[in-house]
Each structure stands twice: as structure tokens, then as C-alpha cells.
Amino acid sequence: MTFTYEGTTHPVIKNFSTKVKPGQKIAIVGPTGAGKTTIVNLLMKFYNIDQGHITIDGVDTGDMKRETVHDQFSMVLQDTWLFEGTIRDNLIYNQENISDEQVIAAAKAVGVHHFITTLPKGYDTYLDDSVTLSVGQKQLLTIARALLKDAPLLILDEATSSVDTRTEELIQKAMDKLMEGRTSFVIAHRLSTIRNADLILVMKDGNIIEQGNHDELMAADGFYADLYNSQFTEEVA
């Protein structure tokens, strides 16, 4: 596929092609501004591609309504989104026939159930400006919401830089749980977390410049290897 933003002349993605199998983990890596979110925007049909096709189970997303495409995906983004309403309402979010047992099971699965039970009204606690949640707690709630939606495809933004180490481990564990049995697209910031990805797309200046798994890309000793080694050195230091 090829994609150019409206009002510009140079394609930000040019002649890119890949096939993703059900249940695979795809990591999208690159420096800030490399175009990682462009891939997400195209998958979600926020923009139409210039040439080529994006298909889900053989069906061209160009022939699908945007809402139908969105139904196929669960998203957990760096900027967590919660609305004014009870915790239960935030977890169920627009879904029908979700039981209390399912809500509690999802919260337990991601490790946020205990925190919810410590609140004065538990799952009926109304979230507004008077309730202060940490970044990590918000992230875990949105992961529980995604688990409840149970969509076959996932988009995860892995950024956890604004939380402490213990919370980061909780979030990573919850994300791993969420990815089980689902096809996942992970916007990776810490490369150490995506070494087990089935496919890594390496982006720079809007282009996909390398692709392969971790071992293949390290053996190629290119941009990804430099990125990984520099980050690993920083983490060790």
C-alpha cells in the first residue's frame, strides 16, 4: 500500500506490503515522529490509502464502514480515556449483555480488582474530578475494558514511562494477558519488551526501512540494531 497525507506530495508510506497471521504480535518501532501512529490510523481507517488494500480475513477495509472496522479492534493508548460515570460503566463502555461476573473477571485478570474494591462504592464509584486515579490505574482500567470487548485485533501503545517500576510490571503483565490469542499491533517504546514479536516493523522518517523478527534484525546490524543497542546501553547505565 501507499499513503500520502492530504496537502503533501511525498508518500509517508510507500509500497509497503506484509501479511499478518491470526494471533501474531506485530511491533512498530522507530524514533519519535517516525510515523508509527500513521500505521495505526490506516488500520483503523481514519484515513483512506492512495493505492493498494488493507484486508481483514480477506475483506477489503475499503469496502467496510469505519464503525465495522473499529468493531474488529480494541485499543489501549498512551493517553487513557475515561468518561464521567461509574467504573462499571467505563469498563462495559457501549457493550450489551455484559454481566457483573464478566466485569469482575476482567478486572481480576489485569490486576485492578483489588484497587476497585478499596474504593467507597467499589465498581459503582462515580468517576469525576473528585476521584483521583494514578496513570497506572487508568491504564489498567482501559486494559480491562479492552479485555471485556474481546475483539480479535488489538492496538497497544506500550508507553509506560510515567509510572513506577512495579506498576509498569503490572501493566506489562496485563497487556500480555490481553494479547493472548489475539492479533496485536504494538507501538513499542522500550525495545526489550518486544523481542518476542513475530514481526517488527522499523520506521524512520515515515518509511518502513526494515522488517523481520528481533534476531533477524539484530543479525542485519542496521538501524534497529543501533536503536536496540543504544537503548539497552541506556537501561544498563
Model-assigned labels for residue ranges:
Residues 1-237:
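ABC-type nucleotide-binding domain
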